Protein backbone atom coordinates (compact mmCIF):
# COMPACT_ATOMS: atom_id res chain seq x y z
CA UNK A 1 0.00 0.00 0.00
CA UNK A 2 2.73 2.47 1.00
CA UNK A 3 6.51 2.36 0.80
CA UNK A 4 9.22 3.90 2.94
CA UNK A 5 7.54 4.40 6.33
CA UNK A 6 9.51 3.41 9.46
CA UNK A 7 6.89 4.25 12.12
CA UNK A 8 8.34 7.54 13.37
CA UNK A 9 6.99 11.10 13.45
CA UNK A 10 4.14 12.92 15.14
CA UNK A 11 1.97 14.36 12.35
CA UNK A 12 1.43 13.63 8.69
CA UNK A 13 1.04 15.53 5.44
CA UNK A 14 -0.41 14.19 2.20
CA UNK A 15 0.83 15.67 -1.07
CA UNK A 16 -0.92 14.73 -4.32
CA UNK A 17 1.17 15.12 -7.45
CA UNK A 18 4.33 14.31 -5.52
CA UNK A 19 6.18 13.05 -8.61
CA UNK A 20 5.89 16.43 -10.35
CA UNK A 21 8.21 19.41 -10.05
CA UNK A 22 6.01 21.42 -7.70
CA UNK A 23 4.65 18.47 -5.74
CA UNK A 24 8.06 16.93 -5.13
CA UNK A 25 9.49 20.25 -3.94
CA UNK A 26 6.55 20.69 -1.56
CA UNK A 27 6.79 17.12 -0.27
CA UNK A 28 10.51 17.46 0.42
CA UNK A 29 10.01 20.78 2.19
CA UNK A 30 7.28 19.39 4.44
CA UNK A 31 9.38 16.32 5.24
CA UNK A 32 12.21 18.67 6.17
CA UNK A 33 9.81 20.45 8.53
CA UNK A 34 9.37 17.20 10.45
CA UNK A 35 6.11 15.88 9.00
CA UNK A 36 5.65 12.31 7.85
CA UNK A 37 4.78 12.90 4.20
CA UNK A 38 2.67 10.58 2.08
CA UNK A 39 3.34 11.40 -1.56
CA UNK A 40 0.49 10.43 -3.89
CA UNK A 41 1.14 10.04 -7.61
CA UNK A 42 0.54 7.73 -10.53
CA UNK A 43 4.31 7.53 -11.11
CA UNK A 44 6.95 6.49 -8.56
CA UNK A 45 7.74 9.25 -6.06
CA UNK A 46 11.42 10.18 -5.89
CA UNK A 47 11.57 12.74 -3.08
CA UNK A 48 13.81 12.21 -0.07
CA UNK A 49 11.98 11.14 3.08
CA UNK A 50 8.61 10.83 1.33
CA UNK A 51 6.37 7.75 1.52
CA UNK A 52 5.06 6.66 -1.87
CA UNK A 53 1.35 5.98 -2.45
CA UNK A 54 0.25 4.97 -5.95
CA UNK A 55 -3.14 6.47 -6.83
CA UNK A 56 -4.86 8.49 -9.56
CA UNK A 57 -6.56 11.47 -7.90
CA UNK A 58 -8.83 11.79 -10.93
CA UNK A 59 -10.48 8.48 -9.99
CA UNK A 60 -12.89 8.02 -7.08
CA UNK A 61 -10.98 4.86 -6.13
CA UNK A 62 -8.17 7.12 -4.91
CA UNK A 63 -10.21 7.99 -1.80
CA UNK A 64 -9.92 4.49 -0.36
CA UNK A 65 -6.29 4.08 -1.45
CA UNK A 66 -5.18 7.31 0.21
CA UNK A 67 -7.27 6.64 3.30
CA UNK A 68 -5.62 3.24 3.70
CA UNK A 69 -2.14 4.75 3.29
CA UNK A 70 -2.84 7.40 5.91
CA UNK A 71 -4.33 4.80 8.24
CA UNK A 72 -1.13 2.76 7.87
CA UNK A 73 0.86 5.79 9.02
CA UNK A 74 -1.60 6.24 11.89
CA UNK A 75 -0.99 9.93 12.57
CA UNK A 76 -3.16 13.06 12.59
CA UNK A 77 -3.01 14.93 9.29
CA UNK A 78 -1.52 18.40 9.63
CA UNK A 79 -1.68 19.35 5.96
CA UNK A 80 -2.94 18.08 2.63
CA UNK A 81 -1.79 19.55 -0.67
CA UNK A 82 -3.50 19.01 -4.02
CA UNK A 83 -0.65 19.66 -6.46
CA UNK A 84 -1.67 17.43 -9.35
CA UNK A 85 -0.72 18.98 -12.66
CA UNK A 86 -2.99 19.23 -15.68
CA UNK A 87 -2.24 17.62 -19.02
CA UNK A 88 -1.89 20.03 -21.92
CA UNK A 89 -5.52 20.21 -23.07
CA UNK A 90 -5.16 22.84 -25.80
CA UNK A 91 -6.21 26.45 -26.43
CA UNK A 92 -9.78 27.74 -26.42
CA UNK A 93 -10.51 27.39 -30.17
CA UNK A 94 -9.56 23.71 -30.31
CA UNK A 95 -9.92 22.26 -26.81
CA UNK A 96 -12.08 19.16 -26.54
CA UNK A 97 -14.94 19.97 -24.13
CA UNK A 98 -14.54 16.49 -22.67
CA UNK A 99 -10.90 17.27 -21.88
CA UNK A 100 -12.03 20.41 -20.08
CA UNK A 101 -14.37 18.33 -17.93
CA UNK A 102 -11.57 15.87 -17.20
CA UNK A 103 -9.33 18.73 -16.07
CA UNK A 104 -11.96 19.94 -13.61
CA UNK A 105 -12.42 16.40 -12.31
CA UNK A 106 -8.67 16.00 -11.81
CA UNK A 107 -7.98 19.22 -9.92
CA UNK A 108 -11.29 20.29 -8.38
CA UNK A 109 -12.77 16.83 -7.95
CA UNK A 110 -9.33 15.66 -6.87
CA UNK A 111 -9.30 18.17 -4.03
CA UNK A 112 -12.63 16.82 -2.81
CA UNK A 113 -11.35 13.24 -3.02
CA UNK A 114 -8.23 14.15 -1.07
CA UNK A 115 -10.13 15.89 1.71
CA UNK A 116 -12.60 13.01 2.01
CA UNK A 117 -9.76 10.51 2.24
CA UNK A 118 -8.27 12.22 5.31
CA UNK A 119 -11.41 13.69 6.90
CA UNK A 120 -11.25 11.45 9.97
CA UNK A 121 -7.69 12.58 10.75
CA UNK A 122 -8.18 16.35 10.49
CA UNK A 123 -8.28 18.53 13.58
CA UNK A 124 -7.62 22.06 14.85
CA UNK A 125 -4.69 23.53 12.94
CA UNK A 126 -4.97 21.21 9.94
CA UNK A 127 -4.45 22.88 6.56
CA UNK A 128 -6.24 22.06 3.30
CA UNK A 129 -4.11 23.45 0.49
CA UNK A 130 -4.75 23.47 -3.25
CA UNK A 131 -2.35 24.65 -5.92
CA UNK A 132 -4.18 26.82 -8.41
CA UNK A 133 -2.51 29.20 -10.79
CA UNK A 134 -2.11 32.63 -12.26
CA UNK A 135 -4.53 31.95 -15.12
CA UNK A 136 -7.43 31.40 -12.74
CA UNK A 137 -7.68 35.18 -12.36
CA UNK A 138 -5.87 36.26 -15.56
CA UNK A 139 -7.76 34.42 -18.32
CA UNK A 140 -5.89 33.52 -21.49
CA UNK A 141 -7.31 31.64 -24.49
CA UNK A 142 -3.99 29.80 -24.70
CA UNK A 143 -4.62 28.15 -21.32
CA UNK A 144 -8.33 27.35 -21.35
CA UNK A 145 -8.29 24.33 -19.01
CA UNK A 146 -5.94 25.92 -16.49
CA UNK A 147 -8.00 29.11 -16.34
CA UNK A 148 -11.38 27.45 -15.91
CA UNK A 149 -10.11 24.82 -13.47
CA UNK A 150 -8.14 27.18 -11.25
CA UNK A 151 -11.04 29.63 -11.06
CA UNK A 152 -13.29 26.79 -9.91
CA UNK A 153 -10.66 25.68 -7.41
CA UNK A 154 -10.68 29.12 -5.79
CA UNK A 155 -14.42 28.81 -5.25
CA UNK A 156 -14.06 25.32 -3.79
CA UNK A 157 -11.40 26.49 -1.34
CA UNK A 158 -13.79 29.13 -0.01
CA UNK A 159 -16.45 26.46 0.46
CA UNK A 160 -13.98 24.21 2.28
CA UNK A 161 -12.96 27.09 4.53
CA UNK A 162 -16.59 27.74 5.47
CA UNK A 163 -17.39 24.08 6.05
CA UNK A 164 -14.30 23.07 8.03
CA UNK A 165 -13.71 26.34 9.87
CA UNK A 166 -15.83 25.46 12.92
CA UNK A 167 -13.47 22.50 13.49
CA UNK A 168 -10.39 24.73 13.42
CA UNK A 169 -9.37 23.50 9.96
CA UNK A 170 -8.35 26.10 7.38
CA UNK A 171 -8.33 26.01 3.58
CA UNK A 172 -5.96 27.84 1.26
CA UNK A 173 -5.31 28.35 -2.44
CA UNK A 174 -1.72 28.92 -3.51
CA UNK A 175 -1.66 30.35 -7.03
CA UNK A 176 1.76 30.42 -8.69
CA UNK A 177 2.41 32.31 -11.87
CA UNK A 178 3.98 30.31 -14.68
CA UNK A 179 6.59 28.20 -12.88
CA UNK A 180 9.98 27.17 -14.20
CA UNK A 181 9.29 23.48 -14.70
CA UNK A 182 9.75 20.88 -17.42
CA UNK A 183 6.00 21.04 -18.06
CA UNK A 184 6.15 24.77 -18.78
CA UNK A 185 9.02 24.17 -21.17
CA UNK A 186 7.04 21.49 -23.00
CA UNK A 187 4.05 23.81 -23.33
CA UNK A 188 6.33 26.61 -24.48
CA UNK A 189 7.91 24.32 -27.06
CA UNK A 190 4.47 23.46 -28.44
CA UNK A 191 3.61 27.15 -28.76
CA UNK A 192 6.98 27.84 -30.36
CA UNK A 193 6.34 25.12 -32.92
CA UNK A 194 2.95 26.65 -33.75
CA UNK A 195 4.53 30.06 -34.32
CA UNK A 196 7.69 28.82 -35.97
CA UNK A 197 10.00 30.46 -33.44
CA UNK A 198 12.62 29.28 -30.96
CA UNK A 199 11.36 28.10 -27.57
CA UNK A 200 13.59 30.64 -25.82
CA UNK A 201 11.53 33.41 -27.41
CA UNK A 202 8.37 32.00 -25.85
CA UNK A 203 10.06 31.61 -22.46
CA UNK A 204 11.28 35.20 -22.67
CA UNK A 205 7.70 36.33 -23.30
CA UNK A 206 6.54 34.41 -20.25
CA UNK A 207 9.24 36.00 -18.10
CA UNK A 208 8.28 39.42 -19.44
CA UNK A 209 4.81 39.01 -17.91
CA UNK A 210 6.53 39.73 -14.58
CA UNK A 211 8.00 43.17 -13.77
CA UNK A 212 10.96 41.20 -12.38
CA UNK A 213 11.31 39.32 -15.69
CA UNK A 214 11.52 35.97 -13.91
CA UNK A 215 9.52 32.79 -13.51
CA UNK A 216 8.40 31.38 -10.18
CA UNK A 217 10.53 28.46 -8.97
CA UNK A 218 9.31 25.21 -7.38
CA UNK A 219 11.32 26.09 -4.29
CA UNK A 220 9.42 29.36 -3.89
CA UNK A 221 6.11 27.53 -4.15
CA UNK A 222 7.23 24.97 -1.56
CA UNK A 223 8.29 27.78 0.78
CA UNK A 224 4.85 29.41 0.54
CA UNK A 225 3.03 26.15 1.22
CA UNK A 226 5.22 25.35 4.24
CA UNK A 227 4.62 28.84 5.63
CA UNK A 228 0.94 27.96 5.96
CA UNK A 229 1.91 25.60 8.79
CA UNK A 230 2.50 28.65 11.00
CA UNK A 231 -0.38 29.33 13.43
CA UNK A 232 -0.62 32.90 12.11
CA UNK A 233 -1.79 31.45 8.78
CA UNK A 234 -5.23 30.94 10.33
CA UNK A 235 -5.86 34.52 9.17
CA UNK A 236 -5.46 33.41 5.54
CA UNK A 237 -8.22 30.80 5.49
CA UNK A 238 -10.32 30.91 2.35
CA UNK A 239 -7.94 33.26 0.59
CA UNK A 240 -5.65 32.98 -2.42
CA UNK A 241 -1.91 33.44 -1.98
CA UNK A 242 -0.65 34.75 -5.32
CA UNK A 243 2.92 33.79 -6.25
CA UNK A 244 3.00 35.38 -9.68
CA UNK A 245 6.05 37.66 -9.31
CA UNK A 246 3.82 40.63 -10.12
CA UNK A 247 2.32 39.23 -13.31
CA UNK A 248 -1.30 39.63 -12.25
CA UNK A 249 -2.71 42.94 -13.48
CA UNK A 250 -6.07 42.84 -11.71
CA UNK A 251 -6.67 44.78 -8.48
Across the structure, where does each feature detected by a protein language model lie?
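Catalytic Tyr-X3-Lys loop
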Residues: 86, 93-113, 129, 146, ...
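Amphipathic alpha-helical dimer-interface segment in Rossmann-like NAD(P)H-dependent oxidoreductases
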Residues: 71-72, 106-126, 161-162, 230
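A conserved structural motif in NAD(P)-dependent oxidoreductases
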Residues: 198, 210-221
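Catalytic loop of short-chain dehydrogenase/reductase
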Residues: 127-153, 157-166, 178
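Short, small/polar-rich loop/turn modules that mediate ligand/substrate recognition or access, typified
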Residues: 165, 170, 236-238
